[in-house]
Design a protein with these regions (language model features):
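Short acidic, glycine-rich loop/turn motifs
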Residues: 1, 44-46
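Conserved catalytic cores of phosphodiester-cleaving nucleases, focusing on short active-site segments
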Residues: 1-14
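Generic structural hydrophobic/aromatic packing signal, biased to beta-strands
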Residues: 4, 21, 55-56
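Hydrophobic side chains in beta-strands
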Residues: 6, 42-43
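Active-site-adjacent loop/helix micro-motif of nuclease/hydrolase catalytic cores
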Residues: 11-25, 30-32
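Intrinsically disordered, low-complexity, compositionally biased regions/tails
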Residues: 21, 35, 80-81
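Non-catalytic C-terminal interaction segments of nucleic acid-processing enzymes
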Residues: 27, 47-108
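Short, positively charged
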Residues: 28-42
Length: 108
């Protein structure tokens, strides 16, 4: 059986073009750094409705994040205790990110 992790991004993504991927909370690994899921589902919501869902193989998403030339880290959540990577959606699917992804697979 395959496991999935489901995250929802509400409204702000429309203005910023970014999604947030949590990696730490209260100084401990969380989100992408703690998940045991095989797949990461990221819902893009408008209000209470799901506009679209992006599905990543979790290992691939980690590889993409690790190979990004620029990634912004921000605090958020309750008490600003969570640390998250802000990933720009256009950048995420750009040719240079896809090329780097292919190159890291070839190098493995």
């Amino acid at each position: 059986d395959k496991k999935i992790e489901v995250k929802s991004e509400r409204d702000v993504w429309q203005k910023t073009g970014n999604i947030a991927i949590e990696y730490e909370c209260y100084g401990k690994p969380s989100g992408i750094n703690a998940t045991e899921s095989d797949y990461w589902f990221h819902n893009l919501c408008i209000g209470d409705e799901t506009f679209a869902t992006i599905v990543f193989d979790t290992t691939s998403l980690k590889r993409i994040i690790n190979n990004l030339d620029k990634k912004r880290s921000v605090s958020g959540g309750d008490n600003n205790a969570a640390r998250m990577y802000l990933l720009n959606l256009q950048k995420l699917f750009s040719s240079d990110v896809i090329k780097a992804f292919k190159e890291t697979k070839d190098a493995a």
